[in-house]
């Protein structure tokens, strides 16, 4: 049996953090998920040209950052220059793509 009906089996997971409230896959979005008492977060991982693992849903940058192109074509230092909050709202300008540490 894979599932028994019990409240103990229910987990609430933030998809890319709390992407409806804050820029997805940013540290502030992950922290808000923790603050709200969520049981976990779901994110995606990509590798940069210098072998760093970064947290970002898309394999390209256009939708959520001020950059363009594929993550795999950037070094971590180059990605850190991009703004991962500005497209969500100017209020969140300056958010960065986080690295998996």
Question: Which residues does each predicted region cover?
Answer:
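Active-site mouth loops of central-metabolism enzymes
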Residues: 14-24, 88-95
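Conserved, mostly hydrophobic/aromatic
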Residues: 15, 33, 44, 79
């Amino acid at each position: 049996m894979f599932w028994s009906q019990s409240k103990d089996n229910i987990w609430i997971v933030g998809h890319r953090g709390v992407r409806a409230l804050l820029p997805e896959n940013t540290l502030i979005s992950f922290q808000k998920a923790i603050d709200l008492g969520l049981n976990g977060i779901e994110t995606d991982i990509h590798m940069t040209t210098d072998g760093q693992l970064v947290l970002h849903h898309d394999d390209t940058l256009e939708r959520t950052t001020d950059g363009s192109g594929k993550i795999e074509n950037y070094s971590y230092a180059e990605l850190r220059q991009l703004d991962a909050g500005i497209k969500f709202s100017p209020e969140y300008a300056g958010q960065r793509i986080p690295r998996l540490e």
